[in-house]
Amino acid sequence: MILNWARQLVCIMNIALISAAMSFCVDASAQNIEDDSLKASVEAEFILDSTQLYVIDELVVVGYGVSRKSVLTGANSSLSAVQSENSNVESALQGRIAGLNVWMSEGGEMGEAEVTVRGGTSITGNNAPLYIVDGFPVDNISNLPVSDILRIEVMKDAAACAIYGARAAGGVIIVTTKKARGDGLETSYKSQYGFSTFKNKLKVLSPYNYAKFCYETAAMKSEETLESFTSVYGSYDELAKYQSVEQNDWVDQLFGENGFFMNQSLLMKYKKDKTAYKISYDYNDNNGILVGQNSRRHNFGMNINHEVSKYLSFDLNTSYYNKIQNGAGVSTEGSNTDARLRNALLYSPLNIKDVEDFESVSSTYNPIAVNNADYRKQTQNGVRGDLGVTITPVSFFDFKSQIGVNGMFRETDRCYGVGTSQALKNGNAPMASILNLRQSTFRNSNTANFYPLKKLKRHSLSLLVGEEFIKKKESYNQSESRYFPEYLNAEQCLANMSLGAPQPSNSAVLPNDVIMSYFGRAKYSYDDKYIFSATYRADRSSKFASDKQWGHFPSLSAAWRISEEDYLKYLQVISDAKLRYSIGATGNNRVSSNLFQQIYTSPSDADGVLEIDGEYLSYLKTGEYKPNPDLTWETTVSRNIGLDLGFLNNRFQLIFDIYRNTTEDLLLQTKLPYSSGYTYMMQNVGSTENKGVELSLSVGVVNRKNFKFDVDFNIAFTDTKIKSLGGVDKMEMSSGWAGSEITGDYILEVGESVGRMYGYETDGWYTVDDFEYEDGTYILKEGIVSDATLLAGNIRPGSLRLKDQNGDGTIDESDKVVIGNALPKHTGGLQLKFQLWNFDLAAYFYWKYGGDVYNANKIENTTTNKYSYRNMSADVEGCWTYLNGEGGIASPEEMAQINANATMWSPIMARYVFHSWAVEDGSFLRLQQLTLGYTLPSKWTDKIKLSKVRVYASANNLFCWTKYSGFDPEVSVRRATSATPSVDYSAYPRSTAFAFGLDVDF
């Protein structure tokens, strides 16, 4: 498979190279460097003549240092200009770098980004990369303001990542924020206003079709049920009156608002003599399309760099953010009561006041009422500070010591009012809870660099040794009170918890997570032509037993700069040609602490407290995880071959990589039998293999004085296989969206990929000819496969029919097969940038080809289950019907004639079933961003003492070309583990955003 991918990409490379060469032959204009951010971030080497200025080499940030890009031996990718039009860092990265996948779990402010480098290697573990911000490791970068980011480096292979050892199996993303470099004062101000709208809606039954469907459902249950229905809505002949009833669009009411957002940022940089500082402020205000959903965030940042002498300097970085989120979102992880979107699709479009016990018989709840009754406010504060001191006693040696802290405090206030699932469990009385979470990280790092061959002309040797200590602390406290008076609002309940019935508090101080590390790197280069590098890191983690704590992670890499050979050195068309190879190991220890020893916990509610003589007494119980003293690191060995090519002074650049990763000792959560007294056990079992091909192209197609056209393209092919599951051949996993009705809807199997969907194959529906009809009862003919056991009821003409895979005549668990795969065949991005005089236009696309989506909404919205009065998807308008023209149950002959043109089975069934009809192709091409800008001429800005003024208009998520029938193909909720991806169930819909902005440099 790898060879096939390589052949395809070679063809693409040849075509692109020929096309670019033809373009360069007719366009040899100069490329002027005007990117202030590049000048500020890294130093660059230039070659100059009277008319041309080309970037030949640049410094890029690597682990614990910097390196010239030309002598890198690892698979590193850089993004030097993050679009200021984006307010979210993760969305700015989507599709920009080959092999870096950024998928949003859902839309809205509460949607989480799933970031993986080269697809990830763990099955039930964490595949997220390690984030480093200005040298400090952080859990995520979602709270970083885009306006403060200067450069992002993505490290993919072991040559680049092994220096970070135990935390780098998922890759490393290094973020460098803006600093002051040039002399004097520089000030920039950015302002953006915009709005978002919800444009893609799912159709449900009209009031008339809904009334007819409810009538049929009632008629099929019993005469009593039908009589109850007709007493409220009328007889069959009277249902025609609902044709004139206006559609009550619950989705439109819930998501019908235009969301408004605003972003303001101010950046000041100043340098004089040997002191430089930067101060930044960013404010983001976002009101989502969901009623009551909004967020606000303040960011402050400061950097001071002072050179005391040529021997001593220090660097101080500090940042603070405050973020407030209001609204509970769509609650995809909660009960059906709280799933806003689910209720908006299923809730009755007609008046229900006269329907007895409507919410119970329909299992639906008024989405607006529940949304208003479910109060959530989350306040999060984060602070980070680190101080670095660098001592350079001689030119070939330096020592740097860094000490830093990172803290986060988050308070989540919840109040569940009347009608929410939590209130219904307690007599429909309001309840409130306050959860306080505290996290802190202390880090100390000491590194020494030695350059023993610095004065030699052709030989270069750099040595790095270092040690690092990281200590993380975490604690939480949750207080809860129930049975508040209904007249109290959410704020009053939370401010007066004693007015309810206080419950036993739930608090814990989690075990410290400590990593102690020693590392080193040696890099040798001969004549900048032959480069060799070796790294080694030893990590000791407190998450494992004392004899399992140490992990060792070496790497070796080499590069041959072919372009520096004499026979190519003077070919002006080739500006760079480098062949790279690397092999090495990284680790993953992202599991909870103390899984290796017995843990006791205190129950968090009254149901788990002993009652003795009317008094509640707390007690301890064993945790849900059985201790495993043999637990240790998950280790990934990475192999990478890469080729870097540059032509015509790097106006055409190509990066091509082939890689193969193998992961052993997978940290796998295994389920234990009930008799063990535990639920799970974390074990080192199994292995995976991850291989793929990546291609990146950057072409300056046209580069004239008043017109420029640049193209950036990347594509990545990834194939992941399970090599072992620790002695078993397969293992079923559950997404859990339907509770216990649908289990084992994903399967892990040796020799296959992760993300395979496991269910039944749709085989149409039963017809009248499949049955004998005796005394009003349908009896399945001999030899016809029966779904009755699976569907939890008698089958009849029109019932869903599933394929009998083993030929035993009965549909059961043994007939489940793989019906989908969430893993895409390839992903990529395309950016087109134009500049015409002072106008600039940028169009940015990204795509996913292949990869199925598990459309759980489709199952629920076309199945009555055991309930009544549910609205259904418009897909059922052509379904099988049991009624004749007079509203009575049709005879077999009438039924066959009426349903001759039916388009699907009857949705009247007693349970949900996961079958292939609900698995859809999730391929898409998205126009993620379209921006048109205009920069005022300098002759205008000079008069008002401004360096630069640019105005722009942009649109995000403007178009998405896909065959997927749901709201959006880029969705993945119910992600309990990496083994159950791409489930679409009641996810927050993605909106289209339009923004107008102003950028001013003083």
Please state what every model-predicted region is.
Residues 177, 266-270, 302-306, 385-391, ...:
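Residues on the lipid-exposed face of transmembrane beta-strands in outer-membrane beta-barrel proteins
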Residues 191, 281-287, 532-541, 583:
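Transmembrane beta-strand segments that form the barrel wall of outer-membrane beta-barrel proteins
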Residues 295-307, 549-559, 947-959:
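Short secondary-structure subsegments characteristic of cysteine-rich extracellular domains
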Residues 710, 821-849, 914-961, 987-1002:
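Conserved C-terminal beta-signal and adjacent last beta-strands/turns
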